[in-house]
């Protein structure tokens, strides 16, 4: 009996408990199960946007994790981020409550669907969202489970009525190779999650399995602008693969005539599919988000749309309806005619892409780029230390904060300060500064921001919460400054 069929019978699963339900991947699966009619609850250490959203749907949320939270549950769902010393896991093991990994639960949801799985080191969330928009524009209503909040829906997951399911496939612990997908997307492959894989070749091998595990009637979509992906594609002959890129003239789908500004990107597309005679040109495709990396993400979506015969009109309409993803180059405030952006970039390649986009926009406005970066995880900084030293070239002024641990134990010699020191010693950046307190960002903006500037707040930790408070903080500072000025003026009058 499959999970999606159980509700057609009298069989019940009882209560399904999610440990860490506030995580973006866990919350999406919990929401879909709830919408399917299953009884869902969960716990997390802190309240956030996802826990509040789920609670508003009637899902019981425990803040804090304790063994009594799973008193009456039948199944426990965990992700790889949950420590085995967690009291709820210990209690589940003690009582022999079945523990299901997040990827296994996702696989069950995908099993009866024609599934599109989007993987890669970067760009998964935006690509998943773009593909979903194209499906809807084509008159299909897919079920979507994403790794970020889709602005069109104000959620990261929603239940559709068609036979399609589109999901972000997390490669962090190799469980993505077990997802039963019909269409597989690989956006890029970079050294990441090496604390799990230990060796980059093992990570590449996992992506190979991701493609070769497809059924014979499925297909993969791969970006061959990325040299590791190109080599992988060249080595696989047993599955159909559609390639895309900007720089790769031999790609099946290529973007050209590219123009970008602060709000959008416009480009033409040349399509030359395998075993199809002739070439198709689609002119003036517009996506309402800037950046070369987002053009690449849209090419992956176009590949799926073309292969499934959506039609050019549906593809263009789908992109026009796209409203972006939370924390992907999201404007959160303005100050002194400078734009403040919140972005999820936390890997060197993501940082380079985000800053390149910001630099392009700043140059058009005669402005500069001010980057404020919060490193995420000691292990990531350790494994990619040299890459982090080199990825901030497009920042005119750079501030690096303390490392956001994300539950990790500190590693000796790996700090935000040590990263800045090494960058300075090796002359990789002459305006790199260590920022001990995020609160000092307000004064940094006040002292440095000018018309046309792009201020980029980056990281996967709590820097986003701070970025989203900047509008209020800067306004409060202005009010305080004006009050001080008025007080001084009144004092002079009284004298």
Curated annotation (Swiss-Prot):
GO terms for molecular function: ATP binding; UDP-N-acetylmuramate-L-alanine ligase activity. Disulfide bonds: none annotated. ATP binds at residues 120-126. One of its GO terms (biological process) is cell division. The keyword ATP-binding applies. Pathway: Cell wall biogenesis; peptidoglycan biosynthesis. Signal peptide: none annotated. Keywords: ATP-binding, Cell cycle, Cell division, Cell shape, Cell wall biogenesis/degradation, Cytoplasm, Ligase, Nucleotide-binding, Peptidoglycan synthesis. It is found in: Cytoplasm. It catalyses: UDP-N-acetyl-alpha-D-muramate + L-alanine + ATP = UDP-N-acetyl-alpha-D-muramoyl-L-alanine + ADP + phosphate + H(+). The keyword S-adenosyl-L-methionine does not apply. Its EC number is 6.3.2.8. One of its GO terms (cellular component) is cytoplasm. HAMAP family: MurC. Cell wall formation. Belongs to the MurCDEF family. NCBIfam families: murC. This is UDP-N-acetylmuramate--L-alanine ligase.
